[in-house]
């Protein structure tokens, strides 16, 4: 084989100057790669012109300009999952599948989360995920001969924040190991991890009923954390037409933490809640900034079952389901695997320890391979890395600087701001923490307007729920509209700012709505206009209301009374129900209120006042 010029190889691998999409093309199938005992990284004729190389490619006959657009494997799977979900039948028996009579489910979870760092774990290359493929790659990332790992000290800080948030004991001395396996996304043939001596052990996290755990778990359940370890991420694989995969090595060496729980989860819904709360917690302490939706957090679940009739029996043989990419997938995959194991055991079979896969939208798991063990991975201490020594003063400093934890914030949102647990959880989990900061900013601006001229102040519980409702539900409508909108996407920054709907603009809109100066319908129309860029600031909202005479000119008392009298005409049958029923028929009253709204000028009617006047009219006629 001809030697590739060193200069061209270096330019290709380290500066991202490659054809089209900038990824290393692999046209050898997985099975073929295993037969060869290696993974193909570079074609032997890499130094030839692009057209010459593709002229004799085995699996691809088109030139790069003729190839279909690159689709990341994760996006491809999600698109397929959406289609499967549309075709799947809905299970209306909510909560009925958390237990199976006569059987106990046991689940342990391994979470892999990308740390919020500027550098990779053992090289100075940047950890940017939005730049051109293979543009942030160091020599060590590709395992070039002679390259050595050098621990980037700053990567330890977010890892410590995560471990302390999980109530772990930080180990003063930890060490790095090599976990050997061969695949094309790991150039070195091994992953550097901390299998034997991790930097954190013996943590715990408590899940509460407000988090959404299974009713069978009661008011709360505490899950033990066995250990937290640092390790490297692998390359990103992009599937191409035919049996071809492209590799983006920007992700190789990105620092991860692996969080390993004890096998103390016994209900699928609680396991899913655990993953969701873990994602929220890691984001809250600024340890990780991307979640499952962007591939920044992945979950593996270990599932086993045993009969409840024998309390002394050991745990059953476990199987592992890899790379679950959504919270819902965690619950569904556990249910499917639990049911499969129970069916197998009840039929007289046995459970094999193996790794299984799961496809979103399906009802069953599938076998991938036999379960690897400690011997298979040939763990060994990494001879190129010394022990990691963590001083007590560093741990104390980080412990004091750890941010407000979600459980405390949830209590404050409920007790101080008057939000429901569901709304509080949603605000904390959306936009990687940006949505809750946006909420605080809007409430502050909203409250300032309301309290001007108010003696003694105004309880925040009087207006914060309105802000939360709009920030969650009306914003949800705007996000749905973005699916067909090619303009700037709807985004909220980590510090709670939104370019499409500025804080001051929403606060001004909500102020007019709360003061009943505009109707809810008008407020929604103004929000849509703001979202589409037709309104730029708070002054323009007020100006738009003035210009189009959108102010709420409510009916007078006499007009409400006349409208109520008109609405009850010809409704003798409905009115008789008010006389005959022992319980006040609220539904019939709202029917009459709806008739009022249809008969009158909707833009001048306050529904709550309409109900009040209609109730008075009905009582007058009884």
Curated annotation (Swiss-Prot):
HAMAP family (alphabetical): GatB
Protein name per Swiss-Prot or TrEMBL: Glutamyl-tRNA(Gln) amidotransferase subunit B, mitochondrial
Keyword set, alphabetical order: ATP-binding, Ligase, Mitochondrion, Nucleotide-binding, Protein biosynthesis, Transit peptide
Reaction it catalyzes: L-glutamyl-tRNA(Gln) + L-glutamine + ATP + H2O = L-glutaminyl-tRNA(Gln) + L-glutamate + ADP + phosphate + H(+)
Family per similarity comment: Belongs to the GatB/GatE family. GatB subfamily.
EC number: 6.3.5.-
Targeting presequence: 1-54
Compositional bias of kind Low complexity: 57-67
PANTHER family found in the cross-reference section: GLUTAMYL-TRNA GLN AMIDOTRANSFERASE SUBUNIT B MITOCHONDRIAL AND PROKARYOTIC PET112-RELATED (PTHR11659), GLUTAMYL-TRNA(GLN) AMIDOTRANSFERASE SUBUNIT B, MITOCHONDRIAL (PTHR11659:SF0)
Entry keyword annotation includes Transit peptide: yes
Family annotation (NCBIfam families): gatB, PRK05477.1-2
């Amino acid at each position: 084989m001809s030697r590739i010029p060193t200069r061209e190889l270096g330019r290709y691998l380290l500066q991202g100057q490659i054809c089209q999409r900038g990824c290393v093309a692999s046209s050898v199938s997985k099975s073929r790669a295993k037969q060869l005992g290696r993974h193909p990284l570079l074609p032997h004729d890499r130094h030839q012109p692009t057209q010459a190389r593709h002229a004799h490619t085995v699996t691809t006959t088109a030139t790069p300009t003729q190839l279909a657009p690159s689709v990341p494997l994760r996006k491809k799977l999600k698109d397929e999952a959406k289609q499967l979900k549309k075709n799947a039948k809905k299970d209306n028996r909510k909560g009925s599948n958390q237990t199976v009579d006569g059987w106990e489910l046991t689940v342990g979870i391994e979470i892999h989360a990308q740390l919020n760092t500027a550098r990779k774990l053992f090289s100075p290359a940047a950890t940017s995920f939005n730049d051109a493929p293979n543009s942030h790659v160091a020599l060590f990332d590709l395992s070039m001969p002679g390259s050595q790992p050098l621990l980037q000290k700053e990567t330890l800080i977010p890892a410590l924040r995560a471990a302390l948030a999980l109530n772990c004991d930080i180990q003063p001395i930890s060490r790095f190991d090599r976990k050997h396996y061969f695949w094309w996304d790991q150039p070195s043939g091994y992953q550097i991890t901390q299998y034997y001596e991790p930097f954190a052990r013996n943590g715990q996290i408590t899940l509460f009923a407000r988090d959404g755990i299974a009713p069978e778990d009661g008011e709360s359940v505490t899950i033990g954390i066995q250990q937290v370890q640092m390790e490297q991420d692998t390359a990103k694989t992009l599937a191409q037409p035919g049996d071809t995969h492209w590799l983006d090595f920007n992700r190789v060496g990105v620092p991860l933490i692996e969080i390993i729980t004890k096998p103390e989860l016994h209900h699928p819904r609680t396991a899913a809640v655990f993953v969701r709360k873990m994602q929220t917690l890691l984001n809250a302490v600024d340890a990780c900034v991307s979640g499952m939706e962007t591939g920044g957090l992945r979950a593996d679940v270990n599932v086993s079952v045993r009969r409840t009739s024998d309390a002394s029996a050991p745990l059953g043989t476990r199987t592992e389901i890899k790379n679950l990419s959504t919270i819902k997938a965690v619950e569904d995959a556990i249910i499917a695997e639990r049911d499969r194991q129970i069916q197998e055991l009840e039929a007289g079979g046995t459970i094999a320890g193996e790794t299984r896969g799961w496809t979103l939208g399906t009802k069953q798991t599938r076998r991938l391979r036999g379960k690897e063990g400690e011997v298979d991975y040939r763990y060994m201490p990494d001879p190129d890395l010394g022990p990691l020594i963590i001083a007590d003063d560093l741990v104390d400093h980080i412990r004091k600087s750890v941010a407000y934890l979600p459980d405390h914030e949830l209590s404050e949102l409920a007790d101080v701001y008057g939000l429901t647990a569901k709304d509080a959880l949603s605000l904390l989990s959306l936009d990687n923490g940006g949505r809750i900061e946006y909420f605080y900013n809007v409430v502050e601006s909203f409250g300032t307007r309301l309290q001007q001229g108010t003696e003694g102040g105004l309880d925040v519980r009087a207006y914060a729920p309105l802000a939360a409702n709009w920030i969650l539900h009306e914003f949800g409508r705007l996000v749905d509209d973005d699916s067909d909108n090619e303009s700037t996407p709807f985004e909220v920054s980590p510090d709670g700012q939104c370019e499409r709907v500025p804080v001051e603009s929403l606060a001004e809109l909500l102020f007019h709505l709360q003061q009943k100066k505009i109707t809810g319908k008008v407020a929604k129309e103004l929000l849509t206009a703001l979202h589409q860029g037709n309104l730029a600031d708070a002054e323009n909202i007020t100006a738009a209301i003035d210009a189009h005479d959108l102010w709420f000119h409510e009916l007078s008392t006499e007009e409400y009374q006349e409208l109520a009298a008109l609405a009850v005409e010809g409704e003798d049958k409905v009115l008789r129900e008010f006389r005959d029923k022992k319980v006040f028929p609220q539904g019939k009253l709202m029917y009459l209120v709806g008739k009022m709204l249809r008969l009158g000028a909707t833009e001048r009617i306050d529904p709550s006042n309409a109900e009040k006047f209609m109730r008075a009219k009905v009582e007058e006629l009884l």
